[in-house]
Design a protein with these regions (language model features):
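Outer-membrane beta-barrel channels and translocator barrels
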Residues: 15, 93, 133-137, 142, ...
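Transmembrane beta-barrel wall of Gram-negative outer-membrane proteins
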Residues: 120-246, 264-277
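Short strand-turn segments of transmembrane beta-barrel domains in outer membranes
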Residues: 68-76, 87-133, 151-153, 165, ...
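Transmembrane beta-barrel strands of outer-membrane/channel proteins
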Residues: 101-109, 149-155, 235-241, 292-296, ...
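Extracytoplasmic loops and strand-loop junctions of Gram-negative outer membrane beta-barrel proteins
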Residues: 51, 71-72, 106-111, 201-207, ...
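Periplasmic N-terminal accessory/gating domains of Gram-negative outer-membrane beta-barrel systems
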Residues: 1-77, 84-87, 107-108, 127
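Hydrophobic, lipid-facing positions within transmembrane beta-strands of outer-membrane proteins
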Residues: 34, 86, 99, 122-126, ...
Length: 509
């Protein structure tokens, strides 16, 4: 069971992606115009194929490249492996006998107030096809070597439109918050976010979500070589590139400049050899056919801060904090050379103050802490140590200001994650068929190898992790080896020092 949608039908549809077209087939559960599920399975149970290649990465193709899209819901052939949901298979167009060219341009403008709508959708599609080498045999006309190339270039000013628009801070208010991110708390307990006192006059209504553009490119090509009357060699491939900023409601009012950047690219190539064999009408074995295919797919994906990219330690960096400490002593009885001695013994270091020098990587957060030190100038209790800074709603490297009413992120709050993936797939398949008497026989094999690798980091948490690990191997005093202080005459001064005890098992750097 299932269905097939032809290129003529696809051309009449408003949305022409593989998933959107497949969702029009009966039996496919649709969600937001895309494939939700097939036969009640999760999305992972649906397997996509493009020109016989099992899809890894993006399924996007140029809109003019589709020849047909087939959906198999039940009775899945063995050649598709262990798919538990359904199969969605797209076949791209091949070369034609005569040269052809098509250009298509769609546009709704460049954004809010600059076109038909606020979202700025623009698409340019170009396709070329035709013969490269024609047969010179008048009895067997046609192309010996033909090609088909299609491309789509898409730009959207807002890739995730909202139904009714949204409120955002005015540029003037953003500038004000940049220079004045905090104010003194009326309760005398530290500072408050200035953004928590936003009023309607500080906001403006927009239909287009800010800083959510998307650039996408899709290419597809096919080269057919008619090596003989009964054999055919085909080469093809596709490439997709996407670069966009993700919409985040939390960031939408104040912090849209920090929307995450998503980058992905998928390219796949294949070679296919097909041969058919002649058979007489009275032959017991007819319609003998086989096909051998090899393919390769490369998929890369990344999300990151668009400015910092792979500079992971800049994500959470606010500035340089220097802790000033002094030695602490307490009266205790210590045994030295078999004698108990009352002396002032070293008890460790105490923090006197933490000074701050702003960094340049995150200007808003740097201003936040500069303002903090300005508001509490001379009041050392608010920056005696890192705990006192945090208790008064100050920031350390890796920290972000508290949200506004638990709804919106504060201006300057950084993207906290970084992720990069590199996936590769190699496939080889062979299939053959023949009619033997009144029976149809099909057989073949398939080999598939995948290599999936990735790296991820909670970038702002790196600073918290480093603070917890630094000097973790010298936290205890070596009280077994006291160091009495003597004057120049060898007289005990009543003071005993200790070195820190090294713990190899706690060493983390």
């Amino acid at each position: 069971s299932g269905g097939t949608v032809t290129s003529e039908e696809i051309e009449k549809m408003p949305e022409k992606s593989i998933a959107a077209v497949a969702s029009t087939v009966g039996g496919v559960f649709s969600r937001d115009g895309e494939v939700g599920s097939i036969r009640g399975q999760r999305s992972s149970g649906t397997v996509y194929y493009i020109d016989g290649i099992k899809v890894t990465g993006s399924t996007a193709l140029p809109q003019s490249a589709y020849d047909q899209i087939s959906v198999i819901l039940g009775g899945i052939p063995a050649q598709y492996g262990d798919a538990t949901g359904g199969i969605i298979s797209a076949t791209t167009k091949g070369p034609s006998r005569v040269f052809g060219m098509g250009i298509e341009f769609q546009s709704s403008g460049l954004g809010e107030g600059k076109g038909l709508d606020a979202y700025g959708y623009n698409r340019l599609g170009v396709n070329l096809n035709g013969p490269l080498i024609q047969s010179k045999n008048p009895d067997k006309p046609g192309a010996i070597l033909g090609y088909f190339i299609a491309s789509d270039f898409i730009y959207q000013a807002d890739n995730r439109p909202t139904a009714k628009g949204t409120y955002v801070a005015t540029p003037e208010y953003i500038d004000y918050l940049t220079q004045n991110p905090i104010r003194l708390s009326d309760e005398g307990t530290g500072v408050w976010n200035e953004a928590s006192f936003v009023t309607r006059d500080d906001l403006m209504f927009v239909k287009q979500n800010l800083n959510t553009p998307k650039l996408e490119m899709a290419l597809s090509g096919k080269l057919d070589v008619k090596t003989s009357e009964m054999t055919n060699l085909s080469f093809g491939g596709s490439f997709n590139y996407s670069n966009y900023r993700g919409f985040n409601f939390t960031n939408s009012m104040f912090n849209y400049d920090k929307n995450v950047q998503y980058l992905s690219s998928t390219w796949r190539v294949y070679g296919r050899f097909t041969q058919r064999f002649r058979s007489s009408e009275d032959a017991k074995i007819k319609n003998v056919f086989y096909e051998l295919q090899a393919d390769y797919t490369q998929y890369n994906y990344k999300y990151q801060d668009a400015h910092f990219q792979d500079d992971l330690f800049s994500y959470g960096y606010i500035g340089q904090y220097n802790t000033h400490r002094s030695r602490s002593y307490e009266m205790a009885t210590v045994n030295i050379d078999g004698k108990d001695v009352d002396a002032m013994t070293f008890a460790g270091y105490v923090e006197d103050s933490v000074t701050y020098r702003p960094g340049t990587q995150n200007q808003v957060l740097a201003n936040y802490m500069s303002k903090y030190y300005e508001l509490f100038a001379g009041e050392t209790d608010y920056y005696r140590n890192t705990n006192s800074i945090l208790a008064a709603s100050g920031l350390l490297n890796g920290y972000a200001p508290s949200s506004v009413y638990n709804l919106f992120g504060t201006l300057g709050s950084n993207q906290s994650g970084y992720y990069i993936a590199d996936n590769q797939q190699i496939g080889v398949s062979f299939k053959a068929s023949a009619d033997i008497g009144g029976h149809a026989l099909q057989f073949g094999f398939q080999f598939e190898q995948k290599i999936n690798s990735y790296f991820s980091a909670s970038t702002t948490s790196l600073w918290t992790l480093m603070r917890s690990r630094v000097n973790s191997h010298i936290t205890e005093l070596d009280t077994e080896n006291p160091i009495p202080l003597m004057d120049e005459n060898g007289v005990f001064l009543g003071v005993i020092d200790y070195n820190y005890l090294y713990s190899a098992t706690s060493q983390s750097t």
